[in-house]
Amino acid sequence: MSMTPEIKNILAEIGVIQSIYQNLFQFLPSFKVTDDSILPYGLKPHTRSVSWLVEQVITQQTKFRKKALGLDDVAFDMPDTCLHDCEITKNGKTYFVNVKIHNMGGRENKNDISAVEKLYMQYSANPDYNLIYACFGIHFKGIEIHFETDYMQLFSPQFLPIYVNPRNDKIQAFYHHDPVLRSRKEFMELLRTNSKSIVLKK
């Protein structure tokens, strides 16, 4: 597909967020989830065991370091129903970001990205809403977390290869994938066509 202004804008937004997070790496600490005496045998190395906590470290450090990162503001107090985890404002423009975590010790599998209905409704209600996913890699051993500075995947759901898991009606994709550049209209139609949700049917 040709590079329309819409597609160029989304790619530019992804580039801005990538630059911000690349700069954030210098501030992201390695840390222990808790004290050794509390969990003397550590945690099982499942991403779900620590993903929310690691996401909080990333979003809170982004806000705490906003001046050094050249940001106007960072908001992360979002309701649980919200598609994005944080709103990053730079030069007066707000970016909507959902932070994901990948365990570098595990395999690259397809992941549930988002419920189709939530994504469809948000993109329908707000034509200016562009969600950006930012996936950070971590090394997780015992109770210690280390960030992998050479791993970062940023993508727009609009450019995902569309596969909807029929069991839960969620888009599934690899964090690392080749983007499929498409218009918002095409994206919405693909969501509608592939969804099993009655709400989305014409």
Model-derived regions: residue spans:
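Nucleic-acid endonuclease domains
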Residues: M1-C82, Y95, I101-K202
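Active-site beta-strand-loop-beta-strand hairpin of nuclease catalytic cores
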Residues: E87-N98
